[in-house]
């Protein structure tokens, strides 16, 4: 292409004009739209799930299963498993470390298994796995189910994330692969921007332990002035001391008296729209390629 520009065969224009022309192509527009939903899911995992685990998931069950009821005092295990200082429960960041650990150890296996499939097929299946993971998070709050959900999402991510670069490289016109690889980041930016606003809002509406605790304090007889005076983040501990009930009992009460999973089902629904879009996009692209080959 550089030789063609120098010889005058191809006229070079401003990069932004060239990029804008490519961005307006249906193949790029549809790509950005259908894959933004997956990146909404991806960001929700790291943005909202840690709060969900902290508020609703008893991760001490995992430690008890592995080391007994007293946990472990081994500093190395505490560090690598992301346990608290007492070694009795897994911290939210420790749970999410499973995602990074699986990607580091299993990405080449997933890549080998998906290599024989069309790129859009692999990404479609990966998106379905990610959606199922969020349904699991919404349906169950048992610690081991959350571990399973994170593992499922990680496999889905491994099927999508590396393939997106390969896909964009394949559909890029000659001499514009670098530009198209830059376009890969656009759906991520759209998904991140939308999730950054709507993800926490959904959680606040359907699953906020803080708000539910304040409501229960009012129901149990605390006046509204006292409830309003409770510092942000301390409503549940106030509820425990006010009622005299255990934190575990109150957590179960709040969980079962509210539809906590709805936030995750809505996020999964967004992913479902994305998965359907990926499927249709893949079929459309295949038809387009066959038409070009026939011509």
Predicted regions and their residues:
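Loop-to-transmembrane helix entry
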Residues: 58-104, 111, 259-265
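C-terminal ends and interior cores of transmembrane alpha-helices
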Residues: 111, 128-141
């Amino acid at each position: 292409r550089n030789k063609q520009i120098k010889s005058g065969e191809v006229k070079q224009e401003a990069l932004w004009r060239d990029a804008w022309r490519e961005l307006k192509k249906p193949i790029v527009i549809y790509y950005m739209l259908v894959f933004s939903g997956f990146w909404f899911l991806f960001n929700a995992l790291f943005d909202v799930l840690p709060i969900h685990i902290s508020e609703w998931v008893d991760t001490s069950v995992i430690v008890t299963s592995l080391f007994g009821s007293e946990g472990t005092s081994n500093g190395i295990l505490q560090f690598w498993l992301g346990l608290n200082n007492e070694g009795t429960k897994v911290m939210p960041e420790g749970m999410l470390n499973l995602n990074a650990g699986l990607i580091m150890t299993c990405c080449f296996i997933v890549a080998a298994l998906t290599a024989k499939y069309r790129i859009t097929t692999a990404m479609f299946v990966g998106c379905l796995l990610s959606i199922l993971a969020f349904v699991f998070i919404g349906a169950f709050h048992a610690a081991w189910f959350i571990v399973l959900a994170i593992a499922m999402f990680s496999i889905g991510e491994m099927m999508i994330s590396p393939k997106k670069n390969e896909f964009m490289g394949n559909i890029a016109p000659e001499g514009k692969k670098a530009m198209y690889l830059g376009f890969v980041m656009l759906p991520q930016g759209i998904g991140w921007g939308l999730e950054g606003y709507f993800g926490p809002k959904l959680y606040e509406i359907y699953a906020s332990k803080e708000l539910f605790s304040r409501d229960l304090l009012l129901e149990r007889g605390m006046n509204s002035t006292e409830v309003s005076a409770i510092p942000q983040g301390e409503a549940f501990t106030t509820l425990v001391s006010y009622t005299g009930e255990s934190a575990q009992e109150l957590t179960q009460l709040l969980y079962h008296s509210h539809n906590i999973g709805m936030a995750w089902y809505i996020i999964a629904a967004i992913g479902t729209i994305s998965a359907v879009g990926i499927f249709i996009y893949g079929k459309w692209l295949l038809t387009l390629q066959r038409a070009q080959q026939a011509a």
